[in-house]
């Protein structure tokens, strides 16, 4: 299968790329290669794929990840392709608790709302998953004293969701976090 992924040069995206590239043709769309999710022209590189992993977050245009999802969903709604959004456990946070990364948290909440609105559309055939990791060992939370997931755990969860979709099983929401204690 052909898989398009945003944000594949570091963190979760790099772990996903490393895990899947032996089995799949990867289309890696990353800012280090001149591809930014702020520019919807990258869509032409995504639509030819079978699976889209919507992983990257834009600090300059926080709504970009949701806009990219909306665009791909609109094109793929009646296909048997798969969209995997990398959301965040922060979708559950109370708005007053978003002081550290308010733009990030609000963008992930908006992505979650768009995902949920699309899920309930009865005429869709595209398979959709939203992976919502808790704190993950990435540059974003470097130095924080919190239990963190390894990026490879998230990559394995994404791989599992791809396998399940291929078997006709849709995992619509997959929340994962490090156990405390």
Regions found by a protein language model. Name each.
Residues 130-131, 143-181:
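C-terminal helical subdomain
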Residues 4-22:
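N-terminal Rossmann NAD(P)H-binding glycine-rich loop of SDR-like oxidoreductase domains
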Residues 46-47, 104:
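A short, aliphatic-rich alpha-helical micro-motif
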Residues 22-27, 125-126:
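A generic structural motif
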Residues 6-7, 49-58, 65, 82-87, ...:
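Rossmann-fold scaffold of SDR-type NAD(P)-dependent oxidoreductases
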Residues 58-61, 73-123, 132-135:
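Catalytic loop of short-chain dehydrogenase/reductase
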Residues 6, 66, 100-113, 147-152:
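Short-chain dehydrogenase/reductase
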Residues 25-44, 58-67:
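Adenosine-cofactor binding site in Rossmann-like domains, unifying the SAM/SAH pocket
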